[in-house]
Every structure is written in structure tokens, then in C-alpha cells.
Amino acid sequence: MYWKTVGVLTTMILTLSCSKDSCPLSSGNTNSEIRELPVFREIILYDKINLILMPDSIQKIRVETGKNLLSGISTIVDGGKLTIQDNNGCKLLRTDASTVNVYISTGPLEKITYHGAGDVGSTDTIRQNHFTVDCVDGSGSINLKLIADSADAIIRTRNADISFNGYGNYSFIYCAAEGSINLSHFVTRVSNIESTSIRDIDVNVTGNLYASILYLGNVYYTGNPVFIQSMITNSGKLIQLP
């Protein structure tokens, strides 16, 4: 009886606290809108939103989802940083599900800070002097085509996956928790790796390889590096692949 009463009260509170606009119970038909925004160099991504990057000289942002959810997908630029969030309420009460896709054409993008559960990809190669993907607490997959003089792939918590395809001069990799990073198709001359993850890291290095393996995940490498320096303090291993 107690839990039944709690359930009824919870439903009443949710129903009363959510207006039709802030708490759409139906996503509606898929729709999209173009948004004009100031120039940005970093994207901060939250929630289950898929991000599709389309490198271009002209900046353009298109948001695609159910028409009842569009207004709740915020895209705000502050200090050169674009923050993308799903502010729609009452997700658990919604009668249907709708994917949220954000398509971004931009040239000066240098960093993605990831807190989300959606997937991130690129339709063409991103070209930058320095590019960073920093997964602060994300749980989706990030797969980018990239050419950069230096590239950072960072997973701090949770179970995100990062993969780059392309080449660069230097890569920095930090992988913790249940994350995995695959740079086997991103050829670099120098790679500096720190692994505290239970999952694996893959790299392709032709010059110097520096690896600190502090937990269970292995580091697999190809590319025949000319110099290798490793520190291993747990059961993870540094393994060369043919």
C-alpha cells in the first residue's frame, strides 16, 4: 500500500510539474531546423545526442529530432564554446523515442568535451594543428577522421570509446575506468600513453612510444617504433602486433 501511494503521488507530481511545452509526452514527426550561431572552437556535448561533424569553411548547424523536442535542444555559444544539451523533461513518461542528431559544418573546431551518451562522427577529415577529444564522463562512441600535428584522446571516467583515422606527428592518450581508445589507424611519430582502464588501447607509432600501464588493460602497438619506454605496475601488458 505504501509503495502504491508513493507511485501515485510521484506520477501526480510529474504530471503537474511538467507543462505541455517543457514535458512533451510524444516526440512528434522528425523535423529539423537551421540555427545561426556565433563562431566557436570547442563543442561541449551532453545527453544522448548524436553529433555529426562535416568539415567546411562555412559554419552551419542543423538540429534534427521529433518536432515536439526541437525547442528543448539547446545550442548556446559562450566564450567560443558551443554547449549542446537536451533540456526536454519527462523522458521516462514519453510514449515514443526520437533520435537527436546535430549536424555541424565548421572549420575552426579544435576540441570536443564529451559528457554524453550519443555517438560522434565525421563525414570527412578534420584538419587542425592541435585537436582534443576529452571524455569527461561520456558513454558513447567517438569515431573521427583526423589529420593533426598533435592529437589528444582522453577518457576520464565511464565506458566511452574513441577512435581516430588519419595521421599526425604526436598523440597523447589517457584512458581510465572502462574506456577504450583505438588509434591503430591514426599513424603518429610519437605517442605518449597512460592507461588506468580495464580495457585496451591500440596505437600505430613509427618513432617513440612511451607507455605507462597502471591497470588491467593492454596496450597494443603496430608501426615498428624505433624507441620504446614503458612502465607497467599491474597485469596489463605492452604487446606488439604483426
Give the positions of each predicted feature.
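Extended, compositionally simple hydrophobic/Ser/Thr-rich segments
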Residues: 41-53, 102, 109-242
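Short carbohydrate-recognition loop motifs
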Residues: 80-87
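Solvent-exposed adhesion/ligand-recognition segments of exported proteins
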Residues: 65, 73-79
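Sec-dependent bacterial lipoprotein signal peptides
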Residues: 1-18
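Hydrophobic alpha-helical segments, principally membrane-spanning helices and signal/leader peptides
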Residues: 2-4, 32-35, 64-65, 101, ...
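Single-residue recognition of alpha-helix boundary sites
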Residues: 13-15, 58, 226
